[in-house]
């Protein structure tokens, strides 16, 4: 019985850590304070998917990815 309880606890912890989302993914879209127009992607936590936007080139936050694949791999 103790072994079964231990296995359950270990499994629960693994599931919890595997499903934990990176806090970067909850940051809002931030175009930055400069005026360039670099095509980038951010994770929209409301729609639960990566979306395109134009990054100004400076400032912003970490929810800023070069490709949709990179965005979804980190956050979806």
Swiss-Prot record:
The keyword Secreted applies. Expressed in salivary glands. The keyword Glycosyltransferase does not apply. It holds the Pfam family Kunitz_BPTI. Residues 25-75 form the BPTI/Kunitz inhibitor domain. Disulfide bonds join 25-75, 34-58. It is found in: Secreted. Residues 1-20 form the signal peptide. GO terms for molecular function: serine-type endopeptidase inhibitor activity; toxin activity. GO terms for cellular component: extracellular space. CDD domains: Kunitz-type. Keywords: Blood coagulation cascade inhibiting toxin, Disulfide bond, Hemostasis impairing toxin, Protease inhibitor, Secreted, Serine protease inhibitor, Signal, Toxin. Potent anticoagulant protein that inhibits the hydrolytic activities of all serine proteases tested (trypsin, thrombin, elastase, and chymotrypsin), with the highest efficacy on thrombin. This is Tabkunin 4. It comes from Tabanus yao (Horsefly). The lineage of its organism: Eukaryota, Metazoa, Ecdysozoa, Arthropoda, Hexapoda.
């Amino acid at each position: 019985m103790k072994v079964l309880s231990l296995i359950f606890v270990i499994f629960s912890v693994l599931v919890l850590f595997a499903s934990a989302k990176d806090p970067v993914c909850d940051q809002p879209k931030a175009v930055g304070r400069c005026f360039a127009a670099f095509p980038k992607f951010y994770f929209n936590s409301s729609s639960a998917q990566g979306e395109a936007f134009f990054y100004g080139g400076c400032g912003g936050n970490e929810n800023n990815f070069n490709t949709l694949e990179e965005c979804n791999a980190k956050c979806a």
